[in-house]
A protein has these predicted regions:
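Short pre-active-site segment immediately N-terminal to redox-active cysteine/selenocysteine motifs
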Residues: 27-30, 35-38, 70, 113
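Thiol-/selenol-based redox modules, centered on thioredoxin-like
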Residues: 116-150
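A short beta-strand-turn-helix
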Residues: 10-29, 53
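Conserved helix-turn-beta segment immediately C-terminal to the redox Cys motif
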Residues: 28, 46-67, 83
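Short, internal strand/loop/helix patches
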Residues: 81-114
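Conserved redox-active cysteine motifs that mediate thiol-disulfide chemistry
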Residues: 34-48
Length: 150
């Protein structure tokens, strides 16, 4: 699986078809954060994601960070920002330029705004999409719902 193959500072270039496959075949509950280096709210919510992944690690929770940066930022700027804000989760760069093509493949309601987050648990059929910054409280609430801990 994509998450197991990657180190935090290795940033693989992927197409939407590969991301769709990762989402469909995930055997773990997963948070997929769509972000960019220029998106301040994206960077502000990252510590919450890392905190929750550590907290619910024993439940198998995984995090995948999907950069939607422009091609000029790949990979150097993404690696630089990831290091500065201490991102430790796997990072991939979505090599797609047509948001009208790839956004509906993630969620039919997605206009392309950032940050955006997809919560999935294929074992239970759980799927929830947020097109906005996620607070620490809402993030934990969503994780508990995804993991059936409520």
């Amino acid at each position: 699986m994509l998450c197991n193959m990657m180190q935090a500072q290795e940033i693989k270039k992927i197409k939407i078809v590969e991301l769709e496959k990762t989402i469909k075949e995930s055997s773990h509950p997963m948070i997929i954060s769509f972000w960019a280096t220029y998106c301040v709210p994206c960077l502000e919510e990252m510590p919450y994601f890392h905190e929750m992944i550590a907290k619910y690690k024993d439940k198998g929770l995984k995090l995948l960070l999907v950069s939607l940066d422009l091609q000029e930022a790949y990979p150097k700027q993404i690696i630089s920002v990831a290091g500065k804000v201490k991102l430790t989760a796997p990072i991939v760069w979505l090599d797609e330029t047509d948001a009208d093509y790839f956004c509906p493949k993630i969620d039919s309601s997605w206009s392309g705004g950032l940050p955006s987050t997809l919560f999935i648990n294929n074992k239970t059929g759980y799927r929830r999409f947020y097109e906005d910054e996620v607070s620490r409280e809402n993030l934990e609430k969503e994780i508990k719902a995804m993991l059936n801990l409520q």
